[in-house]
């Protein structure tokens, strides 16, 4: 129940007072209620973090405020006229203009550090990814496993992650598949799809967490039957405006409702060994690229990040898809405060982060170097190009970043159905084994038929 105070404490604060908590049959009828008294203000700062956080939250999105006046409740909305008046003209401040220029002319050596030391690659430590099933993120064996990776394997994994994660022979990692989207599972390459479910708005309108979990279970089961380990869903953004182009993919304008629906859907899919890419992280504004979203720290945290936060903390989400949006003047995938400080450090997220659809050119504003340096792991690209590849793959900084990214991917993948039970040792599902067997039988049959045809032809030729 704490609110975020961005101006004074710059932290979550639970104000002193009497809090009435009630259970209602509807918005007017109270079935039961209790009053809880907080004797003094509680500031969740420094070592006194909220119980759900790994580290205490503090202001990190000051640059997203922009040069605007925000409506305030102070003195009964005293600044209402100023905050809501249409401006006669508007001019973007110089710091923002400069940042946009840097985004469009990104120097791919920006994040390289010549003091970094090259890590071990290509080692023979005798480990496979299957050995890390159920291992903690901080298990020291990860370092030994990562030492086995080659630079080429890591670079390929990162560059070509469109609807898949690539195989890595050095650690016995199998290739996995990811399918889209929130209301139905679709394979964009084969055209095979599942039945359609109601859109997320309808799911949220039930206010039924059990139903949301059952929906996630259905999606997980269908994904598994179609051979996919990853699901590009659920959509977790907030209905910021009624004209949002993809509102149908998102649950609600209420972050708590959306978060509870999403967390249960994620949990449901995970019961079938499917990891969910909660998307589009974060503050996605419709269906446009490079649209800047301006907001303040309190609104960002209490409204727009809330669904993602609940899905991570309560649903155990271990994959996210990053948005095309700019948070202020910076692409969300290049915003370390979003991808690292909040997502990983504050919320305790462990897993992989994927860009939105990348093509091969990053649409002019996304690139692998900026992404890796700021907490994004892989590019949703199905075409090989310059921007989805690391520019300096032999530099120690790049190798360290690629190594960390591959760890995040493998940590997520090894939790999937690709590594449970029947295929834990080989990393291969029975249906794939059967398919390979059938292919071999057909190939042998065709080869035999070819031999018979050739022999028959030669006999007829000799007889003539």
What kind of feature is each model-predicted range?
Residues 1-6, 13-22, 26-28, 49-464:
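Glycoside hydrolase catalytic-domain context in secreted enzymes
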Residues 29-53:
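Short beta-strand elements
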